[in-house]
A protein has these predicted regions:
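Structured secondary-structure scaffolds
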Residues: 2-39, 43-46, 98-102, 147-318
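Anion (oxyanion) recognition and catalysis
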Residues: 36, 82, 111
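Short, charge-patterned binding micro-sites
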Residues: 48-54
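A glycine-rich phosphate-binding loop feature that marks nucleotide/adenosyl-phosphate handling sites
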Residues: 51, 123-129, 295-301
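A charged helix-plus-loop insertion that forms the helical arch/lid used to bind
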Residues: 58-71
Length: 318
């Protein structure tokens, strides 16, 4: 019996689930069902990304505790997957203690290996994307595009991952197919993005005086982990990576690598095609242990009254 490990992106429960969330989960569920019918041993992992600045901001706006917000909205996602008959085998929630332990263990190892360093930063920051920006992120008109949302100026000290050290390897992995990317035409998009990775390291922390809702750095308690660094690790933390023998999680060595990370085109670059493979390599994963990225597009909703189309990401579902 062949194993088949399929994941989806974990959803951000700062709001209600929408058609984009549903499309991705149903797509992954169809693939998982097909593989089960073929006789494969399937492990289908999905879940929620409960940390980060947007969660903290939404909780503040609603006047509720952020943990309460995370629990309340997570229930909405679970209820929808039950309603749609999505049959997953593993559930990832980033506030789970086993995930926290795994993330902190990885951070400690990378810190000990010299893959993380601390430096001061002064520049621009996208609140929507929760990431720092460079001049290359400006449009031809000299402004930051709408995709970045609110952009503010920041000056603060943070911890960084030596992403740039892995850029040449990443280019080779994408070109050779060691990092699988489907459909094939998405590969060119990734290769174009690697140039920036060769020049910029990844900020993997946020100071607690600005963001308290996250996983604390084990070697510097004044900081929490950047939400993407935290979230990406769910693909291995809930698949048994670094778990003890008494754990009910799968056998990681048998399960990994993932046969399909099902993700939207908006989070291919930089998160899944730049950050994630470089993180894996820094952890000691080899070329033949890299996952396959299965990238889907978006739904457009046609308005009956105007005939115009808009992104379906705001079409709420219940």
């Amino acid at each position: 019996m062949n194993k088949f490990f399929i994941t989806t992106a974990i959803d951000y429960p700062n709001g209600s689930p929408h058609i984009g969330h549903a499309y991705e989960k149903v797509l992954a569920d169809i693939i998982a069902r097909y593989r089960r019918l073929r006789g494969d041993e399937v492990f289908f992992l999905t879940g929620v990304d409960q940390h980060g600045q947007k969660m903290q901001q939404t909780a503040d706006q609603e006047g509720v505790n952020v943990a309460t917000l995370a629990t309340r909205n997570t229930r909405k996602f679970i209820a929808l997957w039950e309603k749609l008959g999505v049959h997953y085998d593993g559930w990832a929630a980033t506030t789970d203690e086993l995930h926290k332990k795994c993330v902190q263990g990885i951070l400690a190892t990378l810190h000990d290996q010299g893959q993380l360093y601390k430096k001061a930063y002064k520049g621009f920051y996208s609140v929507r994307q929760e990431q720092y920006l460079t001049e290359k992120d400006r449009g031809e008109d000299g402004h930051f595009g709408e995709e970045w949302g609110e952009v503010i100026e920041l000056e603060e000290e943070n911890w960084y991952f030596r992403l740039s050290e892995h850029a040449e390897w990443l280019k080779s992995a994408v070109t050779s197919g060691a990092l699988g990317i489907l459909p094939e035409f998405r590969r060119a998009e990734v290769l174009n993005a690697i140039e920036r990775a060769s020049e910029t390291d990844l900020c993997i922390s946020r100071p607690k005086d600005r963001l308290h809702w996250g996983i604390e750095l084990p070697f510097d308690t004044g900081f929490v982990t950047y939400v993407w660094f935290d979230a990406l690790i769910n693909y291995i933390s809930f698949a048994g990576y670094r778990s003890d023998e008494s754990s009910s999680l799968p056998d990681f060595d048998t399960l990994w690598p993932a046969n399909a990370h099902v993700i939207g085109k908006d989070i291919l670059v930089p998160a899944h095609a730049i950050y994630w493979p470089c993180m894996l390599r820094a952890m000691g994963f080899t070329d033949d242990q890299m996952p396959i990225l299965l990238v889907h597009g978006w739904w457009n909703i046609r308005k009956k009254n105007t005939g115009s189309e808009e992104d379906g990401s705001e079409e709420k579902m219940s």
